[in-house]
Amino acid sequence: DEGDPGAFMDRSILEGDPHSIIEAMAICGYAIGANKGLVYIRAEYPLAIKRLKIALEEAKQYGLLGDNIYNTDFSFDIEIKYGAGAFVCGEETALIHSMEGQRGEPTTKPPFPAESGYRGYPTNVNNVETLANIPIIINEGAEWYKSFGTEKSSGTKVFALAGKINNVGLIEVPMGTTLREVIYEIGGGI
């Protein structure tokens, strides 16, 4: 949950390409042996919710979600959970509590969500931006992805430029891009 008022990266991905998130969640579910995924989304994102629901129905119609996907032993489904947009729900234990209908407050670890998370089950928590990268990395390869960024921090990062900056909007830059480059070269300065 991106409760920060100026952040809209995850919403943009869910509005623009919800299928990438569904694909990534199914891949992750297969990799870890899970049969259910949850998408925690702010109720204040009606367009993202609408498009995600449509994409989920399409995935089910094409046999990409549900029981015995492509006539295999693998079954996987995705459920939408609605959040209230509290900034603290970006922390994984707070997010899990909110999905369970509790107050979205973080708790101390251990136990870590991977051991005992949503409803006491082992839970893997990832954000939309991370998930959106999975299908393209699988298609293009790790070496391709590592060609962006630095030796120690490969890949790209999405930022929302908002507030007192000349060029507002979403940008995706290689890891290692300086704040000066983001603000002055891409954002046009303040």
Where are these regions (language model features)?
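Short connector loops/turns at beta-strand edges and beta->alpha or beta->beta junctions
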Residues: 1-4, 30-34, 164
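Glycine-rich phosphate/pyrophosphate-binding loop regions near the starts of catalytic domains
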Residues: 1-18
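Metallocofactor- and cofactor-centric catalytic cores in central/energy metabolism, strongly enriched
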Residues: 15, 46-47
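Histidine-anchored nucleotide/phosphate-binding helix
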Residues: 17-31
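Short amphipathic, charge-patterned alpha-helical segments
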Residues: 24-28, 174-190
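Short internal beta-strands
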Residues: 36-43
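Hydrophobic alpha-helical positions that pack around
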Residues: 49-175, 187
